[in-house]
């Protein structure tokens, strides 16, 4: 499964939805969307959640568009750790063993690139050499 995200400035005027693709829409800041999700007010899937988390630092849409023009696309090959409700990505110390449900290495001494979904709010960790 692939999830694609596109970045562009919205045109002026009213938003027009395709009834085949969406039933509702609203403009919302990334931080507000994540706060709603943390309080069970908005359902998000992991690719959207991680993307929104990465957008929080931008002061406005123009700054975000400018930064993404310079950035290379990021690809995430996910491995699910069902018993821990987590997704792991390359660079995480447990990425190679995630499929066999091995215990995670000592949290304080490892490289981490994961999304912990065991409780709300979700926590995105990208530390050590996984940066």
What are these regions (language model features)?
Residues 1-14, 48-54, 71-77:
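Active-site segment of metal-dependent pyrophosphate-handling enzymes
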Residues 2, 21-24, 76, 83:
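A generic structural signal for well-ordered coil/turn residues at beta-strand boundaries
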Residues 4-10, 16-42:
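NUDIX/MutT-family hydrolases
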Residues 34, 53-56:
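Non-transmembrane alpha-helical segments in soluble domains
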Residues 55, 60-131:
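Core RNA-modification/binding signature centered on pseudouridine synthases
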